[in-house]
């Protein structure tokens, strides 16, 4: 039964249903497919889904690919902080405490 439920989510997410896209990403995450999960979260985030933005930010930081050495990475991190990602706040604090960062 789980296979058919996930197939239904896949079809809904491909048709543009953002909640289904997030659910599909969570399914990928649960099954160890981080890259596919990030793709789901990022696409839903870019279309304005707030939970997807939080999940995407957490994945970027937890997987260590949310580099903040670039302006784009810093903006993603600040967006994750804005929507309440505790891992993002910790990462930003360590970034701010580096000696080469100037306010």
Regions found by a protein language model. Give the residues of each.
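TPR-adjacent "capping" and linker segments in tetratricopeptide-repeat scaffold/adaptor proteins
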Residues: 2-19
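Short helix-capping/linker turns of helical repeat alpha-solenoids
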Residues: 16-17, 47-50, 62-64, 83-85, ...
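Hydrophobic face of amphipathic alpha-helices that form TPR/SEL1-like repeat modules
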Residues: 23, 27-28, 55-62, 94-98
């Amino acid at each position: 039964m789980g296979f058919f439920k996930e197939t239904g989510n896949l079809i809904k997410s491909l048709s543009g249903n953002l909640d289904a896209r997030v659910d599909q990403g969570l399914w990928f995450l649960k099954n160890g497919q981080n890259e596919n999960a990030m793709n789901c979260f990022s696409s839903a985030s870019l279309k304005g889904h707030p939970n997807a933005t939080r999940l995407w930010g957490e994945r970027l930081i937890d997987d260590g690919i949310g580099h903040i050495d670039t302006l784009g990475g810093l903006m993603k991190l600040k967006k994750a902080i804005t929507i309440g990602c505790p891992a993002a706040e910790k990462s930003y604090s360590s970034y701010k405490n580096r000696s080469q960062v100037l306010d």
